[in-house]
């Protein structure tokens, strides 16, 4: 059995690991969205150059028919620029949702950590109340330096040793119990991490929050975006599409790629070509 002090250290270690799991991938996700916004900005600059050329051509043109054609080109360029602006707004909204979701996860971990602390404090208080007063008065002066030295040694131990250290009362528990406690702790931590990645059920869900993926659920955990501009879903959970990490190059969702892993569905490909031709 672990002492209250070591129990608090274990809960602290678990909290730090949960915290790192929640935020360690956040910079990469945000960087991907920022890169998409830069690509949109580059396309927008190209459209501005086209508009300048069309405007100069419109001023020089004297034929009415040619002027109408140039004016039509200007209108299409303006529509494309508006579409790019809408895409940027959508990306920013996704970034805000991503940060809010990770913030809720961190808040949930904080609540769990505080709950463990409250339980530990209550258990420690009951144990102190039940101690015999005569035993506390019978502690000799020679025992006190040993207790202080033990505390200093525990503070100097690394995170793994901190979870296995025992105080003077726990030495009689034996090596098998220490191994059992360590194995049980690892199993509980792995189970909790798997549950967090599998479902966001333990987090408060906003009823107005948009849904994504094939499962039609809110954004949580690791997600990947489909590189098909015509994709109706756009974002997918890693677990729902069988991914463990982000693949290199372009990635298309099961609905868009059809039977092939590297090509999009023929209907969507045709729609994309028609849209490019109309532009």
From Swiss-Prot:
GO terms for cellular component: nucleus; Sin3-type complex. One of its GO terms (biological process) is negative regulation of transcription by RNA polymerase II. In the adult, widely expressed with highest levels in thymus and testis. It comes from the Eukaryota. It holds the Pfam family ING. GO terms for molecular function: histone H3K4me3 reader activity; zinc ion binding. Residues 154-171 have a biased composition (Basic and acidic residues). A zinc finger (PHD-type) spans 210-259. Zn(2+) 2 binds at residues 226, 231, 253, 256. InterPro entries: ING1_PHD_Znf (IPR028643), ING_fam (IPR028651), ING_N_histone-binding (IPR024610), Zinc_finger_PHD-type_CS (IPR019786), Znf_FYVE_PHD (IPR011011), Znf_PHD (IPR001965), Znf_PHD-finger (IPR019787), Znf_RING/FYVE/PHD (IPR013083). The PHD-type zinc finger mediates the binding to H3K4me3. The polybasic region (PBR) is responsive to the binding to phosphoinositides (PtdInsPs), including phosphatidylinositol 5-phosphate (PtdIns(5)P). Interacts with H3K4me3 and to a lesser extent with H3K4me2. Isoform 2 interacts with RSL1D1. Isoform 1 inhibits p53-dependent transcriptional activation and may function as an oncoprotein. Isoform 2 acts as a negative growth regulator by cooperating with p53 in transcriptional activation of p53-responsive genes and may act as a tumor suppressor. Belongs to the ING family. PANTHER family: INHIBITOR OF GROWTH PROTEIN (PTHR10333), INHIBITOR OF GROWTH PROTEIN 1 (PTHR10333:SF85). This is Inhibitor of growth protein 1.
